[in-house]
Amino acid sequence: APNAGELTADLRQVLDTGAPSDARAAKLAGGQAAVPTADNIANRLNTYGGMVSWEVQNPVLNGDRVDAQLAVSIPIFGTKTHNIYWVDQDGQWKLSNPSACVIAHDVAGVDCTV
C-alpha cells in the first residue's frame, strides 16, 4: 500500500492544473470526469497562495482501499483533518469520488461534479 508521502505526491499532481490532464485523470477514480472537480479545488486553493498547507496522513490498508486523513493547516485557524480514501483500480491507487467531493466541499468550498 502507498505511504503518506506517496499519497501526498499523488494528490499534489491531481491538484496541479499545469500537469497533463491524462496524468491527473489516471490518479482519480472518476478519471477525466473527475478532473473538473480537481480543477475547482486547485483554483480555490491557489487563491489562498501559501496560506494553506496540507498533507495526507495515517494511511491504512483496508481491504481494497486505503483510508487516510487529509490534514489542512491554515494560519490562525489551525489544522483540521478530513477522512478520505483511495481505491484500487486496475492495480493503481486512485482517489475515490466521494473523497474528491469531501475535499471540494469541506476543504475548498467548491462544487463537486463526480
Model regions and ranges:
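Homeobox/homeodomain signature
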Residues: 4-5, 18, 44-49, 83, ...
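Surface-exposed, charged secondary-structure patches
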Residues: 40-79
